[in-house]
Amino acid sequence: MRTITVKGTGNVSARPDYIILSLNIEVLSETYDRAMSEAAERIERLQGAAVRVGYRKEDLKTTSFDVQTRYENVKDRQGNYKREFAGYACTYRLKLAFDFDSKQLAKVISAIADCGAQPELSIAFTVKNPARVSEELLISATENAKTKAEILCKASGNALGQL
């Protein structure tokens, strides 16, 4: 029994059917309490914006939260730099995900812009079920590999056996 090995490549295209908005809020304040309360206020504003356009406040999910001390380098009178405490940085990373709808996306972005929370914003257009796309890609690659194997077998005067 002779064996040949072939590699298949696959191609799949999928139209985006899902939108993920990533929102980052960072507050820097001299005190921990002030940083936390200002961040909480900005989160409440974002939740209110989400509710105004038809979502529940729970739909705005926190993906990460951290508090760090910040320092800055300051030049003293002798020209030497030294680190000075700048405050506490409270950072929230949130996401809001929903089925693809460009009109709804425009409403959400407008509500966020109008709420005064001033988050950093990024928009990802993706597919809701990436496993289905991966499955289609594997099928395409397998069909490509089988076609290559059939061509090699025909050219060499052999029959394709079990796969």
Language-model-detected regions and their locations in the chain:
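Short, charged, surface-exposed interaction patches
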Residues: M1-L163
